[in-house]
Structures are given as structure tokens and as C-alpha cells.
From Swiss-Prot:
This is Small ribosomal subunit protein uS8. Keywords: Ribonucleoprotein, Ribosomal protein, RNA-binding, rRNA-binding. Part of the 30S ribosomal subunit. Contacts proteins S5 and S12. One of its GO terms (cellular component) is ribosome. It comes from the Bacteria. InterPro entries: Ribosomal_uS8 (IPR000630), Ribosomal_uS8_CS (IPR047863), Ribosomal_uS8_sf (IPR035987). Belongs to the universal ribosomal protein uS8 family. The keyword rRNA-binding applies. GO terms for biological process: translation. One of its GO terms (molecular function) is rRNA binding.
Length: 132
């Protein structure tokens, strides 16, 4: 069975594992998912990720991050652009998440960027998701 929205599946797996406080979560690999994991790592939302080659598609193993007392670092993940309704933002319309406390992930002509990076590069694109 094919998956209609693999990015939404990745976000849901992370959200579910985060709620039950798993240390790691495995998602099927793709280039876009690797870039999304890289951004989550750079922004400090996860501890790390590894790409595991299994002879097929590959797996991304994401190490989730928690605070000193076990509180979740990722409090929310929301998919914005969906297969049935794509959401695009020009460089001057890029949304801020929780007034700058979260990030929006944007697919641009210069690759997958955060909202801050896209504003700095002066590019717009498809708003993939919000993370806070």
C-alpha cells in the first residue's frame, strides 16, 4: 500500500513516540525526511539521527530529546501543506510560529530551510510544517 503523505507519517511517528517518551523512533528514509531531521537537530529539537541502510529504502532512527525532568522538548508538530491543499508563502509572508518560539519548515528553491533561514535568503516556498 502506498502512502499519500510520507512527511505527515514521519511527523505523526515523532509526535506519538514523544508523547509516550520513547528514546528513539524509526521512520522510512527519504532525502526530504533526512533534511527535516537535519533541521530538527540544528534547531535543538532532537538529540540526533542516524541513517540505517537496510538494502531497501533505508531507515532514519531519530533520538528524541527531553529536558532534565523528563519534559518534552517538542511540544507540538503540525503539518501545514497537505497533498490536497498545498500552502505556499512568499518571502515577505513567511509565518512566525508562536512569535518566534517555534519554527516553520519551508521547502524552497535553495532546499529545506527554517523560516529564519528563508527570510535571510529572501526566498519563499511551500510551508511544510510547524514545530514548537
Amino acid at each position: 500500500m502506498t502512502m499519500t503523505d510520507p512527511i505527515a507519517d514521519m511527523l505523526t511517528r515523532i509526535r506519538n513516540a514523544n508523547v509516550v517518551k520513547h528514546e528513539t523512533v524509526d521512520v522510512p528514509a527519504s532525502n526530504m525526511k533526512k533534511e527535516l531531521a537535519r533541521i530538527l537537530l540544528e534547531e535543538g529539537f532532537i538529540r540526533g539521527y542516524d541513517v540505517i541502510e537496510d538494502g531497501k529504502q533505508g531507515i532514519i532512527r531519530i533520538q528524541l530529546k527531553y529536558g532534565q525532568e523528563g519534559e518534552r522538548v517538542i511540544t507540538g508538530l503540525k503539518k501545514i501543506s497537505k497533498p490536497g491543499m498545498r500552502v505556499y508563502a512568499a518571502n515577505h509572508e513567511i509565518p512566525k510560529v508562536l512569535n518566534g518560539l517555534g519554527i516553520s519548515v519551508i521547502s524552497t528553491s535553495k532546499g529545506i530551510l527554517t523560516d529564519k533561514q528563508a527570510r535571510k535568503e529572501n526566498v519563499g516556498g511551500e510551508v511544510i510544517c510547524y514545530v514548537w
